[in-house]
Regions:
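Conserved helicase RecA-like core
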Residues: 1-168
Length: 168
């Protein structure tokens, strides 16, 4: 079902009929930083997301990258795959101790890591200068999460790029 607007009665009816409906809300764009270029990556049939990600991270300019995933399990899986490909990465999420998260964040800030993988919970607490790219490995569940993720790049008047993977 596609509609430009839905009133509450329509939303109630939809929730009665559809199983696990997905709501896509498009905003005016005024909510995100104007210094951030936002791009979608449409995965074609047969493309493996982690392989596309690894290829992206080999490109020039992908120096300080934050990757966001929906769950702690996904964050750990992505980190494991990137490390197997000799990409300097680490992860932060709720199952890691505060000490571990701080060490990983400090290593990322110091340039010892190319990539930091995090859950949305971490998105609000990450304050790092010069993040070149943000990659949404999975589409965030809310507009608020998207805004906070994308807001990790393009700070202090600098430009940044945010990518979001889209699967068919």
């Amino acid at each position: 079902l596609f509609s430009a607007t839905l009133d509450r009665a329509q939303e109630r009816r939809i929730s009665e009929i559809l199983v696990d409906p997905i709501r896509l809300q498009i905003s005016s764009g005024d909510l995100t930083n104007n210094h951030v270029q936002q791009e979608l990556i449409h995965l074609k049939d047969g493309q493996v997301k982690i392989e596309v990600l690894k290829e992206m991270l080999q490109r020039p300019g992908f120096d300080k990258v934050i990757i966001f995933a929906e769950t702690k399990r996904w964050v750990s899986k992505i980190n494991r795959k990137l490390r197997q490909a000799d990409i300097r990465s680490d992860e932060i999420h709720g199952d890691k101790s505060q000490n571990y998260r701080q060490k990983a964040l400090n290593s990322f800030k110091a340039g010892k890591l190319q990539v930091l993988i995090a859950t949305d919970v971490a998105a609000r607490g990450i304050d790092v200068d010069d993040v070149s790219h943000v990659i949404n490995y999975q589409i965030p569940r809310s507009m608020d999460s998207y805004i906070h993720r994308v807001g990790r790049t393009g700070r202090a008047g600098k430009t940044g790029i945010a990518y979001t993977f889209i699967e068919s």
